[in-house]
């Protein structure tokens, strides 16, 4: 053995900065919960804050200190004072194009580079009686004859629906309008996006599924907003210039029929917090307009958050009604709801579709699954709409995940099927640092999904500070240090910290020479370098260091071309 390289990489997750944007949840019939990230408490909202009534779709957003900014049911937008914004009031004819009966009627995405502007993406309910009337205003019967009321469920225009399937659209909220309470910008309101073939009338009459999710782009300066229709995924990029209206389209299994799309379009879509996966639930794949079927499914895909392309479809659940889906904070587990069960899938298993665990079973319908800023997953359970079930340790397998029914009491209001979705990357805030040894440059960076104006680092050793986004610092003594980062965005200042351990430089001790003999004279000799590892590390903790072997000093210096073990 001639060459040895020891390499250590540390990634420390923190609770702060990005997660705080998901601090306020408003959903159901006057229900809501608030996360206090400083104390770790979760409380139900009071009666004065109960200003929403939606059975499914909803979305909310806070600033990076956890202060409420606004929330929506996809039609109305309420400001931080719980008042409907003037240019987003459905009953007054100024509403948005979502629907409270759409699975994900709204999703709020910050406009990169502008802390005062947010996009509200809306997805309408694709109603078959609007499709029957297309291109005219619904409702209509199956023969296209106009009717006064909807029959499934009962309702009328304009009180319950505008008579059109509006598909995916977006509107811009400017928080500087309306005396600083925010309002929708008229020139960027209800901008419809193309998620269908305009040459196919039936596609155009439905336009889009009730599904929408968002995740950070690999450049960390923009987002992907993703939806689905029939057998296509549509990924729209949002950057500092606005919404790119030409999507990245991935045509991939399964094919969901438009024949029963009123029900076929139901179900959640979620991106994993690390941006590597997309999971989607299809409530059913029936062929009767407005009819029910039991042939639902859940699928998971690899996602390239550089290109926006999905690949490698894997069917996890078949022939069962599916509704909610959510990833664990570390993206290693997937949870699904529907058909009276909540299931957990181990995505690290060789065959994830075979590695599942039933966490909950009920005679009613389990609704949305939503990851919270406290790292727990909250579950809408129709059996008791005055509370939420909680998965307390979603990174853990099986019973260790800690499923607890009725854990989160809703002191006012009740839940429906929906809970507010967020940009999944909000739940992946972290300080990253490489090289935690004495007399070696330790490289720091902060993973943030929101633009900021400045950052001030304090490395905790009483020496210097830095205002660089990705600074390096050299510690001269081993020990435990508290590193803090003070981030300024506009007038808001947020400080968070993390404890790191700086170790003495690792020592690669020379192991004994290895004598190898080609006993069977076949020209192949095996080298087992695992056994000498004890000699290489000596008294150093093998759980803290990785030993790798290389054919050249250059490879060792660049930590490339590590030999696989055993080596032949």
Task: Label every model-predicted segment.
Residues 1-24, 321-323, 427-428, 437, ...:
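Bacterial Sec-dependent N-terminal signal peptides
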Residues 19-432:
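Beta-propeller fold recognition
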Residues 424-507:
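Extracellular/lumenal mature domains of secreted and surface-exposed proteins
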Residues 431-437, 512-519:
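Short beta-strand segments of immunoglobulin-like
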Residues 439-448, 522-535:
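A short beta-strand segment in extracellular, disulfide-stabilized domains
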Residues 449-456, 531, 535-551:
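Solvent-exposed loop segments of extracellular immunoglobulin-like
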Residues 454-473, 541, 550-568:
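Surface-exposed, flexible coil segments in extracellular/virion-facing regions
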Residues 462-463, 515-525:
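Acidic, glycine-anchored loop motifs typical of Ca2+
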């Amino acid at each position: 053995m001639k060459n040895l390289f020891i390499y250590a990489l540390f990634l420390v997750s923190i609770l702060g900065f990005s997660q705080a944007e998901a601090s306020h949840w408003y959903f159901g019939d006057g229900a809501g919960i608030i996360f206090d990230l400083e104390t770790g408490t979760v409380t139900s909202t009071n009666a004065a804050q109960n200003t929403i009534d939606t059975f499914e779709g909803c979305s909310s957003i806070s600033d990076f200190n956890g202060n409420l900014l606004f929330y929506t049911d996809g039609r109305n937008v309420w400001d931080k004072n719980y008042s409907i914004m003037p240019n987003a009031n459905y009953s007054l004819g100024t509403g948005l194009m979502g629907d409270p009966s759409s699975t994900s009627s709204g999703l709020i995405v910050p406009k990169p580079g502008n802390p005062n502007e947010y996009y509200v993406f809306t997805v309408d309910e694709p109603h078959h009686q609007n499709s029957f009337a297309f291109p005219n205003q619904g409702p209509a019967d199956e023969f296209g004859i106009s009717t006064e009321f909807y029959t499934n469920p009962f309702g009328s225009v304009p009180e319950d629906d505008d008579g059109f399937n509006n598909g995916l659209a977006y509107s811009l909220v400017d928080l500087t309008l309306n005396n600083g309470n925010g309002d929708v910008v008229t020139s960027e309101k209800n901008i419809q996006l193309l998620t269908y073939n305009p040459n196919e009338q039936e596609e155009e009459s439905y336009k889009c599924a009730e599904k929408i999710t968002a995740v950070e782009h690999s450049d960390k300066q923009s987002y992907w907003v993703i939806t689905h229709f029939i057998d296509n995924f549509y990924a729209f990029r949002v950057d500092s210039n606005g919404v790119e209206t030409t999507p990245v389209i991935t045509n991939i299994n399964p094919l969901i029929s438009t024949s029963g799309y009123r029900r076929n379009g139901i179900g959640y879509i979620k991106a994993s917090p690390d941006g590597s996966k997309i999971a989607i639930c299809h409530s059913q794949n029936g062929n009767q307009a407005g009819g029910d079927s039991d042939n639902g499914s859940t699928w998971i895909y690899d996602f390239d958050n550089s290109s926006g392309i999905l690949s490698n479809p894997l069917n996890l659940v078949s022939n069962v009604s599916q509704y909610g889906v959510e990833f664990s904070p570390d993206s290693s587990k997937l949870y699904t709801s529907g058909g009276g069960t909540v299931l957990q899938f181990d995505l690290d298993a060789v065959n994830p579709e075979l590695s599942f665990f039933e966490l909950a079973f009920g005679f009613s319908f389990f609704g949305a699954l939503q990851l919270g800023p406290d790292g727990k997953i909250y579950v809408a359970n129709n059996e008791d709409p005055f509370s939420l079930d909680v998965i307390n340790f979603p990174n853990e397998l099986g019973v260790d995940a800690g499923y607890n029914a009725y854990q989160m009491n809703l002191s006012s209001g009740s839940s429906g099927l929906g809970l507010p979705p967020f940009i999944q990357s909000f739940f992946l805030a972290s300080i990253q640092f490489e090289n935690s040894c004495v007399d070696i440059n330790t490289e720091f960076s902060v993973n943030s999904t929101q633009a900021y104006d400045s950052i001030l680092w304090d490395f905790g050793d009483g020496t210097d500070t830095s205002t660089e986004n990705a600074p390096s610092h050299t510690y001269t003594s081993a020990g435990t240090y508290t590193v803090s980062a003070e981030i300024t965005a506009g007038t808001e200042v947020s400080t968070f910290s993390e404890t790191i351990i700086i170790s003495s430089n690792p020592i690669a001790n020379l192991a004994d020479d290895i004598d190898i003999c080609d006993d069977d004279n076949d020209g192949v000799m095996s080298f087992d370098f695992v056994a000498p590892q004890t000699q290489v590390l000596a008294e150093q903790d093998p759980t803290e260091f990785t030993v790798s072997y290389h054919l050249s000093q250059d490879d060792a210096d660049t930590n490339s071309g590590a030999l696989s073990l055993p080596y032949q």
